[in-house]
């Protein structure tokens, strides 16, 4: 049976007068609508010629059909290309039911029929649904080729309204009006201040997270700082000299590079809210990312200002240049012993993955503290000082602390708990997604694992039956020094699906080199701020019949 598009059948009937062609060919109009088929009865041809002649005729028809189909599409595309759509109209087409539309430059495309054919799978294409393709093509440069554009042209339905391409004017009274443009793939938890995470299917695509989809945690509006006038103030030690460092001054210090994973204390908080309500953003599994950072070592800069290790306890306090309308800036601190240890790798970073820091990630300078919770990696760094006590910032003293499940907002005493520094061992499943349908036969499971304090992940265990039986996943990633494992490990497991199984309860848990392991459930580690959420990660999927 030869299946041709309905439009091709019409054109073939018009151009070739199929009823008079000798051979035996059955042509059926292709349609997802069965009611269409009776309009095109079977066309049967017979004759005494050999099968060779029949195949020649079929080849001719196929070639002619392809040409006519292309010509028919070009005609339809030309007729529809004058249609003008607003950005709002495009954004309303985000599902197979409404149609999957995307925009590239000034053109609008309906890629609904192509979604299942997308080489990266429909889920990747759906990330761009209702919006522009450019940010995703920037991540996957292989798309920006002539044959890909030719393929995309087949799905053009119109043009984007020119007014939607004009940049909006900045409202100066809005403290967030000058925030940078963000990648549309990010899953937004808060617009003001901006907080967002990459979707899980993109998070573990690369060992090094691309800058545009690195998770973003902001507490205040993003400052727009001039690199030429920027100065970093380092308060000198008693008898030492305070420093006022420009970017060029920082570049004059020895440059160090280090791969570091940053994780928000609230990563996977959404799982704690399923136990009981907590205060905080509804982070899923994406408040974690990895980058290659470069800059001056904090210990070198502090030594230049006369600081050295002392026998009494001391803390290095950081103040950012982001502030609220009252002038209150974000602040945090780490122990002086960590800051002064060259092996700890604490950086005053000015590069991220070989590029100047993006604004959302601290341009022009931020602190990077390997193995420590993201809250201490102060961005837009403006001032560094050494104090006998930790920072008096709200975010150091009254936030980012863990408590017993029995503590509520009526009984909490923030002074009774230490500030979070190192984080516990963590892992999560990024593929497949919860609720997804997987093929029978074999399932591929992917995810990440990481532990704080430089502790290396030595094993990830995966279960398909909720934890009754386990298999060991394969670990990928850079080899790291013992107790200096600052970056995550990506992991993968290909496992057979048990015959007849209709559902899978997939679970993962990681073990670090201190043999710390994740707890099995959330309830015993629940706390009112929803931090330190590291129970076994669970994904429930269905198996295709």
Swiss-Prot record:
Residues 175-401 are annotated as: Moco domain. This is Sulfite oxidase, mitochondrial. The modification Phosphoserine is found at residue 123. Pathway: Energy metabolism; sulfur metabolism. Mo-molybdopterin binds at residues 215-219, 264, 322, 361, 366, 377-379. Pfam families: Cyt-b5, Mo-co_dimer, Oxidored_molyb. Residues 402-538 are annotated as: Homodimerization. Keywords: Heme, Iron, Metal-binding, Mitochondrion, Molybdenum, Oxidoreductase, Phosphoprotein, Transit peptide. Binds 1 heme b (iron(II)-protoporphyrin IX) group non-covalently per subunit. It is found in: Mitochondrion intermembrane space. GO terms for molecular function: heme binding; molybdenum ion binding; molybdopterin cofactor binding; sulfite oxidase activity. GO terms for biological process: sulfur compound metabolic process. The keyword Protein biosynthesis does not apply. Residues 165-174 are annotated as: Hinge. Homodimer. It catalyses: sulfite + O2 + H2O = sulfate + H2O2. Residues 1-79 form a transit peptide. Its main location: mitochondrion. Its EC number is 1.8.3.1. SMART domains: Cyt-b5. GO terms for cellular component: mitochondrial intermembrane space. Its cofactor is heme b; Mo-molybdopterin. Gene3D superfamilies: 2.60.40.650, Cytochrome b5-like heme/steroid binding domain (3.10.120.10), Oxidoreductase, molybdopterin-binding domain (3.90.420.10).
């Amino acid at each position: 049976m030869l299946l041709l598009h309905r439009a091709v059948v019409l054109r073939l009937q018009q151009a070739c007068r199929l009823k008079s062609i000798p051979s035996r060919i059955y042509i059926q109009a292709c349609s997802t609508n069965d009611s269409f088929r009776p309009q095109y009865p079977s066309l049967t041809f017979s004759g005494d010629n050999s099968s060779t002649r029949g195949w020649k005729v079929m080849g001719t028809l196929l070639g002619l059909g392809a040409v006519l189909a292309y010509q028919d599409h070009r005609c339809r595309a030309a007729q529809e290309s004058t249609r003008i759509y607003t950005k709002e109209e495009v954004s309303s087409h985000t599902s197979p039911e409404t149609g999957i539309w995307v925009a590239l430059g000034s053109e609008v495309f309906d890629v609904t029929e192509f979604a299942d054919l997308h080489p990266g799978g429909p889920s990747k294409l759906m990330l761009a649904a209702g919006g522009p393709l450019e940010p995703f093509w920037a991540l996957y440069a292989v798309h920006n080729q002539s044959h890909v554009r030719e393929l995309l042209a087949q799905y053009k339905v119109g043009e984007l309204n020119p007014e939607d391409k004009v940049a909006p004017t900045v409202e100066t009274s809005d403290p967030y009006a000058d925030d940078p443009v963000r990648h549309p793939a990010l899953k937004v938890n808060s617009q003001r201040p901006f907080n967002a995470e990459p979707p899980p299917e993109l998070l573990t695509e690369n060992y090094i997270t691309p800058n545009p989809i690195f998770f973003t945690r902001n507490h205040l509006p993003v400052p727009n700082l001039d690199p030429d006038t920027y100065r970093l103030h380092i308060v000198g030690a008693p008898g030492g000299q305070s420093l006022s460092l420009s970017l060029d001054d920082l570049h004059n210090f020895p440059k160090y590079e280090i791969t570091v994973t940053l994780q928000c204390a609230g990563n996977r908080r959404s799982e704690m809210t399923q136990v009981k309500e907590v205060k905080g953003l509804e982070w899923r599994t994406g408040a974690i990312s990895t980058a290659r950072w470069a800059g001056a070592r904090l210990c070198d800069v502090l030594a230049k200002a006369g600081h050295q290790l002392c026998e009494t306890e001391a803390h290095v306090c950081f103040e950012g240049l982001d502030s609220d309308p009252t002038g209150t800036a974000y602040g945090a601190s780490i122990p002086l012993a960590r800051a002064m240890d060259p092996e700890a790798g604490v950086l005053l970073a000015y590069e991220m993955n070989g590029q100047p820091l993006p604004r959302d990630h601290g341009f022009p300078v931020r602190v990077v503290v390997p193995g420590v919770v993201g809250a201490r990696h102060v961005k837009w760094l403006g001032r560094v000082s050494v104090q006998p006590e930790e920072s008096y910032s709200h975010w150091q003293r009254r936030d980012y602390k863990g408590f017993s499940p029995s503590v509520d907002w009526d009984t909490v005493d923030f002074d009774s708990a230490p500030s979070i520094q190192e984080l516990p061992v963590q892992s999560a499943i990024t593929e497949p997604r919860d609720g997804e349908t997987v093929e029978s036969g074999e399932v591929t499971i992917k995810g990440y694992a990481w532990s704080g304090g430089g502790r290396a992940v030595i094993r990830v265990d995966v279960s398909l039956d909720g934890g009754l039986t386990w298999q060991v996943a394969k670990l990928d990633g850079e080899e790291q020094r013992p107790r200096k494992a600052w970056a995550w490990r990506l992991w993968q497991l290909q496992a057979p699906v048990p015959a007849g199984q209709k559902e899978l309860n997939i679970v993962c848990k990681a073990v670090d080199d201190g043999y710390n392991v994740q707890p099995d459930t959330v309830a015993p580690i629940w706390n009112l701020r929803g931090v330190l959420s590291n129970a076994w990660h669970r994904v429930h999927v269905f198996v295709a019949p």
